[in-house]
């Protein structure tokens, strides 16, 4: 999960209270969330939903409230449903959602699990951690088991880009300018607009040298 700034005004169509997923809503959400599912961080997912962060349950105000509409992939929306209705909010500027939950990437493309660990001991963080664990490690149906495996492989592919840069950065034969370029490329991988940025950010945060160097670039909403 990544930090988001909702810097777009409410799309005009919402004022009519007819549809909450008109084209202007989609366009605005795509910009605000960088075309990423706010839960799993998949970029440009094929199956997308306008999700109600708090289930509206027939409440017209919640149904058409711009601040309650989120960019979600169909899979995450299906798993979340109404059960997970008290999550930490990635659009809340008072909460650093990235640092609230540790994301550990899989060590191989077909690793059976990846680690999600709450860093704060409160109900919202624990529930969000539980949801993320289910998203990435689900085995509750055959379909979800297979799709979770595909998702972990995508995370690993992005992680592998970071591994290549780390190998270059820490090489005994690296030139100063090459080291600087590797560092700049790492900054691109931890930007909120990058896929699975939470996983790569945590790798950097836990590195004794790179953590202090890139700390100020991590978790900064775009």
Model-identified regions with their sequence ranges:
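Short, charged surface segments at domain edges that flank catalytic/cofactor-binding sites
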Residues: 1-36, 58-64, 160-163
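Tryptophan-centered motif/residue detector
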Residues: 26, 66, 196-199
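DNA major-groove recognition helix of helix-turn-helix/homeodomain DNA-binding modules
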Residues: 76
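Domain-level detector of nuclease and nuclease-like folds
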Residues: 81-171
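C-terminal, charged low-complexity interaction regions
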Residues: 130-222
């Amino acid at each position: 999960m990544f930090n988001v700034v909702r810097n777009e005004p409410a799309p005009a169509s919402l004022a009519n209270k007819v549809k909450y997923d008109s084209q202007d809503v989609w366009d605005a959400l795509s910009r605000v969330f960088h075309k990423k599912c706010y839960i799993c961080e998949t970029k440009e997912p094929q199956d997308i939903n306008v999700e109600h962060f708090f289930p509206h349950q027939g409440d017209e105000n919640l149904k058409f409230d711009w601040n309650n509409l989120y960019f979600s992939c169909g899979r995450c929306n299906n798993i979340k449903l109404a059960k997970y209705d008290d999550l930490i909010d990635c659009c809340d500027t008072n909460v650093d959602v990235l640092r609230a939950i540790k994301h550990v990437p899989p060590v191989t493309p077909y690793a059976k699990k990846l680690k999600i660990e709450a860093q704060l001991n409160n109900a919202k963080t624990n529930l969000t951690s539980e949801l993320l664990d289910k998203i990435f490690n689900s085995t509750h149906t055959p379909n979800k088991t297979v799709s979770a495996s595909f998702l972990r492989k995508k995370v690993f592919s992005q992680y592998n880009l970071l591994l290549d840069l780390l190998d270059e950065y820490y090489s005994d034969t690296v030139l100063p300018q090459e080291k600087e370029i590797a560092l700049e490329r790492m900054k691109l991988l931890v930007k909120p607009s990058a896929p699975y940025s939470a996983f790569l950010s945590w790798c950097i945060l836990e590195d004794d040298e790179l953590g202090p160097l890139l700390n100020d670039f991590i978790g900064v909403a775009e």
